[in-house]
Design a protein with these regions (language model features):
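Short, structured segments at the rim of ligand-binding sites
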Residues: 1-400
Length: 400
């Protein structure tokens, strides 16, 4: 969200800003570009003003280690007519992360894209033009990049097969607060009437449903009673039903959520014969793919068998082999599907996490449910999404 405000030169105040590493990296980029940045860590309030920014494509390259840096291209293109992006923009190691959908969007709005010394130079001599575009896949970042370009372009643009995740909806509401004209928020078709200057203002972020779910799952796998405040129950109907597949009931009341189990975790048997209980992850409103690892952790600990299907990424399940070090029985059907055979006795182990945020958390979840000392190596990605993960765990009584 911090990136989106570069389309305005008016002051902005953002509330509820998470203290995560990606935010700090983005703010460092802003400072390099000459923006005024004030972050109050105690109140999680961020003040930004981009009135005196500067950009030189020959010296300013957007960082390749953050996938979100690709969303700096539209604001830079709109304000300076040029941006330079590494052609191997990374993120979590989930498999091939395509940039072609973004290139298609930049080109459709009138941008020219060319390779230059290991990077992509995106430039536009003329103002961006309104377009109609159809995504071949409902990508979150591609959807947001389209909206950023469309807001800057003169005229009415339309996107079909838009992503509609809660954070995409919040992003659109943020743009509307700044003065953007967007219809279809929360649907697969967005209409943006652009060209008007954007203003400043105040905006408060809602709590991340991924983090809420993570702590509910931690309570469920350990048998603890964890209450998460400032919850967002409107995002949870399908997540709640998925918890129920493992014998966990989720209660939402008065702004908080709690996961409850009356006995050991147990995979619920489907009414359909000859099929496994399954969790299918795909673009929203399907089950969120980012949450699949923590439910695989529940599946390992639960009695019974379950199928987990990642319909998006081709390299996001390779880590499940690490679970065997705990004594878990997990079968990889193909790059997109694994089956957990739960109920095996589990023992402490030393495991290694790939660079995937919630895989590190999933491995921790399994370890936390086993008596004894385990070690999760390469767990630093957790800080990219959970600013006070260890501190919160200790407040719940965990020895970390």
């Amino acid at each position: 969200m911090c990136i989106r405000d570069r389309l305005t030169d008016q002051p902005l105040r953002l509330h509820g800003v998470p203290d995560i590493t990606d935010v700090r990296k983005i703010l460092d980029i802003f400072r390099t570009l000459g923006s005024e940045v004030q972050l109050d860590e105690a109140t999680r309030t961020l003040q930004l003003h981009h009135r005196d920014t500067r950009f030189d494509a020959s010296s300013h390259r957007l960082p390749e280690e953050m996938r979100s840096s690709i969303m700096l291209v539209p604001p830079l293109l709109a304000r300076f007519g040029v941006a330079r992006l590494e052609d191997n923009v990374k993120g979590c190691t989930l498999g091939v992360r395509e940039i072609d959908p973004h290139v298609d969007i930049f080109r459709s709005f009138g941008g020219e894209v060319e390779r230059a010394s290991g990077s992509l130079l995106i430039h536009s001599a003329a103002p961006l033009k309104a377009v109609r575009h159809w995504l071949d896949y409902a990508s979150v970042t591609a959807t947001e990049n389209f909206v950023l370009c469309a807001v800057a372009a003169q005229g009415e643009s339309m996107l079909t097969n838009a992503a509609c995740e809660p954070h995409v909806q919040e992003f659109c509401r943020f743009m509307v607060m700044m003065g953007a004209d967007i219809d279809g928020i929360g649907t697969s078709r967005l209409t943006v009437r652009g060209g008007a200057p954007l203003g400043g203002g105040d905006f408060t972020f809602e709590e991340d449903f991924h983090e809420i779910t993570t702590f509910l799952a931690l309570g469920a796998i350990t048998g603890g009673d964890v209450e998460v405040r400032n919850s967002t129950p409107d995002n949870f109907p399908l997540i709640d039903r998925t918890f129920a597949k493992f014998g966990v009931q989720v209660e939402h009341k008065n702004g908080w959520s709690r996961a409850l189990r009356s006995g050991p975790l147990k995979v619920q048997t489907p009414f359909t014969s000859n099929v496994l209980t399954k969790v299918e992850a795909a673009p929203w409103p399907y089950f969120p793919v980012d949450l699949l690892p923590i439910f695989i952790a529940l599946g390992v600990h639960a009695q019974g068998n379950a199928l987990f299907w990642n319909k998006i990424y081709d390299g996001a399940l390779g880590w499940t082999g690490e679970l065997s070090k705990f004594g878990a029985h997990v079968f990889s059907s193909d790059p997109h599907r694994v089956v957990t055979f739960g109920g095996n006795p589990l023992t402490p182990a030393v495991v290694e996490s790939p660079y995937i945020i919630r895989v590190a958390i999933a491995l921790f979840m399994v370890a936390s449910s086993i008596e004894g000392r385990s070690e999760i190596r390469n767990a630093t990605p957790i800080r990219r999404a959970h600013p006070h993960f260890v501190e919160n765990l200790r407040s719940l009584g965990a020895r970390v």
